[in-house]
């Protein structure tokens, strides 16, 4: 079979099903990535969300015996919000990162990959394939880099010449020996804007990320957020775009190619106070379609509390007192107490002290004491 012709046929077909960029790579082991992952593991830079088996992350043969090549795909997503609602005193709003706008991208990319699989099976009935998006074993970034989708930027994102880094990535391992594409040369040069601006210093050096410091990771954790990071969250409800928005390669990049990726402004820039008491049913109905809902509502509610503290939003004090007193989840009770201490105001200290009288959880009591300390500092 003429595999070069088949490759061209696949490229042509990909354009008809809404794939913005496609590349082909060999399925040989990712030896350089393996060394980086071992180092990351030794330095404790991993988030815990990734596949723990480094061999599986770097050897496609373990995932599909007889693998010959990997097809990488990229879909561009919007970077600008049309008709964005204003955040103002009394009506403060949070923000979801761009990668969580619209329908869950895992579903969108899986749809494209399934169509690609069906096309290839029709051409080659005996073909073997294994597709994955984000949560699969392989590193999307390493595959895309090898397949010429883009280069791996210092912000730890794949940067494409056509769409910047505002792209979702997915891949398909196959036993078909497609001719590989050439990687794109690194075009970051001496620029360090992303490293310099990272709020928590998570970008240790070019292409190296301490995931446990990354705000995108921190917003997804479920426990108490370490106090050193709370002020740095700002009004972020889920994820962080800072290292992308500052990137010169993203200037002017805003693509609205896929209707299912179009964001609802009220969802991706939501009012903060209503989030504090949203029911499970309402949360699933409103936010269930978004990738940002995958960890459930508690982390987002905790982040909404931190955002209200960031704004020092006095109008939210009654709601925060209600959460501190009555919410069954210790993380939210304690975070609300801390936030009340940050905001301050008449009656706040008394409310915290009264709540302490019946609070049994040690971590919550610690946060309540911390809230009182913050109030005392305001009086000094």
UniProtKB/Swiss-Prot annotation:
Main location: cytoplasm
Disulfide bond sites: none
Keyword entries, A-Z: 4Fe-4S, Cytoplasm, Iron, Iron-sulfur, Metal-binding, Oxidoreductase, Queuosine biosynthesis, Repeat, tRNA processing
Residues forming the catalytic site: 134 (proton donor)
Coiled coil: none
Necessary cofactors: cob(II)alamin; [4Fe-4S] cluster
Domain 4Fe-4S ferredoxin-type residues, every copy: 178-208, 226-258
Biological process according to GO: queuosine biosynthetic process; tRNA modification
Domain of life: Bacteria
The protein's Enzyme Commission number: 1.17.99.6
UniProt-annotated binding residues for [4Fe-4S] cluster 2: 198, 214, 240, 243
Molecular function in Gene Ontology: 4 iron, 4 sulfur cluster binding; epoxyqueuosine reductase activity; metal ion binding
Record keyword Lipid metabolism present: no
Cofactor: record remark: Binds 2 [4Fe-4S] clusters per monomer.
Catalytic activity: epoxyqueuosine(34) in tRNA + AH2 = queuosine(34) in tRNA + A + H2O
SMART domains tied to this protein: EZ_HEAT (SM00567)
Span of the signal peptide: none
Location(s), subcellular: Cytoplasm
Record text on subunit structure and interactions: Monomer.
Protein family per UniProt: Belongs to the QueG family.
Protein name: Epoxyqueuosine reductase
